[in-house]
């Protein structure tokens, strides 16, 4: 009869937790686990009998009711195939999950009496440098900035494997979305300033929520008028490293950016999955040029998933029109990067280093 060590069991649980919290396709999850931990799926082992209680306490939580339901279905089917009894607590959890959701409760388990928010959310978590981080995402893909996209994972991988590039730098992120990149930057010490920006009020609210969910202190500029100098001066005296603020790309007079305190000091400009709308490419590149021109030796790192080649070609054309130097560092980065804490499809994602040549 196969014996499984405590260490092996812990590794199995940890791997399952990583896959589960990133919402990996359930059959793919079990296939991966079976390949890496075959002893847990052999009919002659007794070790899987006591796993349900461990799974109940360590695994079966969010990210969503639907995903949890599919997970428990697959788990019970696997146990039944192995002719093992399904733990009663697992079945109780399953019945709880599939029961009708109350009118005042959304997918995050919260009470909606006050907010009346009927949006369904999912919660994805990642284990990075001995620490779990969690992001609240929208379940439906209705608003770009409410989802954590693959390019954000690539850019986060780049940051984690090139931390020396970011130490003691002022960093600006365009289109910060759910805030993954901002949270990853918190792993780097020291930093001077991190400015996270987006445009949609809903996205900014969620961005702020995710930062605070992961215990990051922020300066909140979301509801400030940019010409309110007294208010901004007071906030600039705040010693918090992270700022969250509104930034609309569609501005004709870029000099208005001078009113955004700290933007012109950016040494590094970051962006992930921000090349998706053809009409915005001109404005995005104009902002990149404006900021790169004002700070000598500044550089931008833009990670993009190429879903539509024509849209990406417009972006490339606008970069050429501004005489910006563009280097595709995707392969160079992939060859040197360590194992990623994220599970995602890299096949259509590119990473550009963009800067302005000195005259």
Curated annotation (Swiss-Prot):
The record, for InterPro entries, names: Methyltransf_16, SAM-dependent_MTases_sf
The record ties this protein, via SUPFAM superfamilies, to: S-adenosyl-L-methionine-dependent methyltransferases
A Pfam family annotated for this chain is Methyltransf_16
Which molecular function GO terms apply here? Answer: protein methyltransferase activity
Kindly give the CDD domains that the UniProt entry links to this protein.
AdoMet_MTases
PANTHER family, per database record? HEPATOCELLULAR CARCINOMA-ASSOCIATED ANTIGEN, PROTEIN-LYSINE N-METHYLTRANSFERASE EEF2KMT
Q: What is this protein called?
A: Putative uncharacterized protein DDB_G0277003
Origin species: Dictyostelium discoideum (Social amoeba)
């Amino acid at each position: 009869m196969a014996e499984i060590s405590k260490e092996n069991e812990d590794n199995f649980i940890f791997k399952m937790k990583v896959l589960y919290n990133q919402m990996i396709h359930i059959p793919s999850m079990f296939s991966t686990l079976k390949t890496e931990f075959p002893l847990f799926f052999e009919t002659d082992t007794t070790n899987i009998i006591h796993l349900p209680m461990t799974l109940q306490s360590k695994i079966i939580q969010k990210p969503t009711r639907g995903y949890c339901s599919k997970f428990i279905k697959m788990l019970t089917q696997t146990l039944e195939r192995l002719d093992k009894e399904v733990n009663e607590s697992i079945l109780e959890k399953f019945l709880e999950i599939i029961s009708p959701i109350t009118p005042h409760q959304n997918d995050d388990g919260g009470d909606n009496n006050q907010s009346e928010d009927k949006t369904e959310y999912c919660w994805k978590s990642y284990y990075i440098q001995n620490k779990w981080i969690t992001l609240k995402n929208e379940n439906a893909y209705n608003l770009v900035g409410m989802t954590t996209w693959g390019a954000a994972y690539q850019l986060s991988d780049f940051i984690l494997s090139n931390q020396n590039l970011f130490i003691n730098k002022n960093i600006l992120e365009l289109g910060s979305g759910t805030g993954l990149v901002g949270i990853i930057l918190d792993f780097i010490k020291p930093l001077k300033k991190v400015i996270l920006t987006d445009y949609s009020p809903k996205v900014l609210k969620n961005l702020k929520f995710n930062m605070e969910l992961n215990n990051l202190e922020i300066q909140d500029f979301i509801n400030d008028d940019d010409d309110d100098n007294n208010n901004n001066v007071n906030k600039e005296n705040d010693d918090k490293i992270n700022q969250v603020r509104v930034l609309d790309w569609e501005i004709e007079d870029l000099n208005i950016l001078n009113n955004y305190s700290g933007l012109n000091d950016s040494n590094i400009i970051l962006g992930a999955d921000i090349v998706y709308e053809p009409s915005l490419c001109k404005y995005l590149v104009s902002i990149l040029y404006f900021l790169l021109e004002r700070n000598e030796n500044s550089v931008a790192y833009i990670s993009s998933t190429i879903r539509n080649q024509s849209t990406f070609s417009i972006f490339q054309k606008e970069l050429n029109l501004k005489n910006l130097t563009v280097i595709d560092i995707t392969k160079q980065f992939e060859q040197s990067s360590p194992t990623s804490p994220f599970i995602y499809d890299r096949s259509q994602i590119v990473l550009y280093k963009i800067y302005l040549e000195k005259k």
